[in-house]
């Protein structure tokens, strides 16, 4: 029987429920339990695919093409398990499903209500994850904060589910804040007490409290929370601020979170195997070489817009013993200032994905700077398209070359709409999404990095390289190193007369993991370190020359 763990949050938003859920998943998996993690988001959007990155952060794409919350990226990276569209549920998708049933007449003329129809649909979504993959444990994170009106149907559904599947098969975990008041010189339990009171008024008694704090919580305060919140003192867990999110599983293991979870769910206690994770964290905290990477993007005012890119760079830095320093550059600034004003001194340049014409010329300027100055460059999705435009304009002799997305009247549309996108009207969920195979050509940088002929990568785009210009770019020295298996779609391009210059149409950042960094990122960071540390000795199998 699958066990169900529900993670709620109180006191403040952005308290770190996703990291707690992902960390618990890591701890259970280290004990050889299979885990799937589900996110319930209370917003009315069907999915985050059409939401602004400035509001929502990045859109994380699963293997099966679902556009999901960035927390699913944490789930995948921490548990090293691929999630699917079943692992992401929004209020909008719940209401859409119920309303479609009502329109079909499935409710036989009955009045459709939040209880039972909406709550039943929520419960069915949770149970479907267990049915699909039959994991030992399904961890469900409920978005928002207890007390928010938007979250009430989700909380009611998980309250009902305990009776439905059996009390011994459900655990409620509440993540709260324990603030330290400097003027009083003490930590305060009252916010947590009130948050638990709010949760109990809904009918949910938490089994475990995970208390976020910037310092250790004294035993006396844990005892106080135990008495006021009716939780065993050993189930009051400190989640102290860490230097890195990857240290959190180790902190929670030291607090006994997994042990208490297994005890409450009546599961077998097993010894954890966290040696590789501990070694990874140790590597993160003991770098040998400083490496500064510029991220030239359109949404840099919100770092979460490029969360998976940053984490993939971090994974690669760990593998290459690099101390990663990021220089965030708004691509619009490069449209009015010389690139060296912002890019001078960086060891590598990443141009990530995005949509729309704003800031594109700045991205193209950054790419030209990287190519001219022999600075390692990695282009992702839109970054790949911009690299093709830059080459076509400045090397291929196609003055004014552009993407049809940015200029529908351009004389040289080197990037064009995918044929299957021609008649698409709706924006949501209609792009080329999810995993597609890619054939790697031999004797290329891509083949040296991947060490494989066929790879699988995740996509999210409507536009592609225009094959009408394939031969022209090849003749001018550009190399196409990855295509769809039928050779029709160009997926990877590179410039061989350069220390490291490669771009891909897909999003490799979505498949990078702390202990298995993505080869494109590892090769890129290694090349960037070599810029400022030519004698660096890398303990990594990646060879880029």
UniProtKB/Swiss-Prot annotation:
Residues the entry annotates as binding Mg(2+): 71, 141
Catalyzed reactions: UTP + L-glutamine + ATP + H2O = CTP + L-glutamate + ADP + phosphate + 2 H(+); L-glutamine + H2O = L-glutamate + NH4(+); UTP + NH4(+) + ATP = CTP + ADP + phosphate + 2 H(+)
Active site: 381 (nucleophile), 507, 509
Binding site for L-glutamine: 354, 382-385, 405, 462
Pathway(s) the chain acts in: Pyrimidine metabolism; CTP biosynthesis via de novo pathway; CTP from UDP: step 2/2
Keyword entries, A-Z: ATP-binding, Glutamine amidotransferase, Ligase, Magnesium, Metal-binding, Nucleotide-binding, Pyrimidine biosynthesis
One GO cellular component, as annotated: cytosol
EC nos: 6.3.4.2
Misc. comment: CTPSs have evolved a hybrid strategy for distinguishing between UTP and CTP. The overlapping regions of the product feedback inhibitory and substrate sites recognize a common feature in both compounds, the triphosphate moiety. To differentiate isosteric substrate and product pyrimidine rings, an additional pocket far from the expected kinase/ligase catalytic site, specifically recognizes the cytosine and ribose portions of the product inhibitor.
NCBIfam families in UniProt: PRK05380.1 (NF003792), PyrG (TIGR00337)
Name of the featured protein: CTP synthase
Organism in which the protein naturally occurs: Nostoc sp. (strain PCC 7120 / SAG 25.82 / UTEX 2576)
Lineage: Bacteria, Bacillati, Cyanobacteriota, Cyanophyceae, Nostocales
Gene that this sequence comes from: pyrG
């Amino acid at each position: 029987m699958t066990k169900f763990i529900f993670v709620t949050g109180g006191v403040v938003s952005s308290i770190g429920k996703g990291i707690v859920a992902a960390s618990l998943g890591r701890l259970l998996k280290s004990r050889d339990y299979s885990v799937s993690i589900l996110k319930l988001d209370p917003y009315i959007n069907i999915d985050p695919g059409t939401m602004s990155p400035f509001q929502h952060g990045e859109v994380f794409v699963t293997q099966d093409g679902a556009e999901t919350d960035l927390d699913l990226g944490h789930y995948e990276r921490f548990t090293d398990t691929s999630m699917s569209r079943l692992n992401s549920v929004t209020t909008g998708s719940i209401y859409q499903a119920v309303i479609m049933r009502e329109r079909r007449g499935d409710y036989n003329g009955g009045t459709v209500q939040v209880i039972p129809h909406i709550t039943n649909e929520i419960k069915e979504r949770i149970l479907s994850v267990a049915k699909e993959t039959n994991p030992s444990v399904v961890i469900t994170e409920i978005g928002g904060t207890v007390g928010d009106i938007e979250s009430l149907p989700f909380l009611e559904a998980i309250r009902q589910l305990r009776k439905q599947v059996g009390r011994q098969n459900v655990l409620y975990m509440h993540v709260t804040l324990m603030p330290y008041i400097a003027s009083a010189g003490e930590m305060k339990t009252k916010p947590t007490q009130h948050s638990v009171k709010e949760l109990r008024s809904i009918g949910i008694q938490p089994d475990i409290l995970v208390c976020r704090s910037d310092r250790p919580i004294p035993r006396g305060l844990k005892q106080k929370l135990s008495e006021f919140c009716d939780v065993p003192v050993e189930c009051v867990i400190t989640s102290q601020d860490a230097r890195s999110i990857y240290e959190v599983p180790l902190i929670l293991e030291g607090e006994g979170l997994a042990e208490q979870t297994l005890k409450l769910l009546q599961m077998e206690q097993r010894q954890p195997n966290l040696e590789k994770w501990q070694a990874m964290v140790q590597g993160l905290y003991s770098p040998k070489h400083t490496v500064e990477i510029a991220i030239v993007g359109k949404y840099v005012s919100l770092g979460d817009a490029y969360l998976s890119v940053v984490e993939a760079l971090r994974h690669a830095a760990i593998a290459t013993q690099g101390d990663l320093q990021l220089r965030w550059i708004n691509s619009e600034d490069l449209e009015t200032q010389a690139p060296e004003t912002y890019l001078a001194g960086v060891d590598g340049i990443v141009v990530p994905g995005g949509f729309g014409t704003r800031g594109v010329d700045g991205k193209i300027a950054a790419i030209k700077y990287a190519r001219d100055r022999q600075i390692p460059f990695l282009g992702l999705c839109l970054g790949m398209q911009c690299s093709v435009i830059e080459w076509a304009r400045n090397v291929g002799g196609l003055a004014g070359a552009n993407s049809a997305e940015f200029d529908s009247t351009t004389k040289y549309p080197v990037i064009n709409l995918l044929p299957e996108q021609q008649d698409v009207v709706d924006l949501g969920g209609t792009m080329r999404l999810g995993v597609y195979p890619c054939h790697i050509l031999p004797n290329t940088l891509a083949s040296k990095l991947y060490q494989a002929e066929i790879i699988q990568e995740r996509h999210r785009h409507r536009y592609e390289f225009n094959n009408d210009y394939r031969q022209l770019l090849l003749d001018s020295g550009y190399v196409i190193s990855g295509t769809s298996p039928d050779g029709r779609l160009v997926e990877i391009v590179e410039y061989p007369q350069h220390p490291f210059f490669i771009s891909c149409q897909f999003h490799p950042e979505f498949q990078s993991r702390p202990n298995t960094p993505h080869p494109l990122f590892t090769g890129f960071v290694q090349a960037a370190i070599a810029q400022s540390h030519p004698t660096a000795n890398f303990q990594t199998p990646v060879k880029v020359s």
